[in-house]
Amino acid sequence: MLRWALIFFIIAIIAAVFGFGGIATAAAGIAKILFYLFLVVAVVMLVSALLAGRNITR
């Protein structure tokens, strides 16, 4: 799950480059939305990975 958090974080960074950098002005609004969406998903995956690691009992 930690790997997925890293993947979503990288996607968020790429969306930020396009959205905030002005490279693609036509898609800037969509890229900004995708940045925040994938950033939230990355944080959720990171938190769930950390919580799942703590709850392992054998």
From Swiss-Prot:
Pfam family, one: DUF1328
Subcellular location field: Cell membrane
Keyword field contains Transmembrane helix: yes
Keywords, alphabetical: Cell membrane, Membrane, Transmembrane, Transmembrane helix
GO CC terms of this entry: plasma membrane
Regions crossing the membrane: 4-24, 33-53
Annotated membrane topology: Multi-pass membrane protein
Protein name: UPF0391 membrane protein Gbem_0127
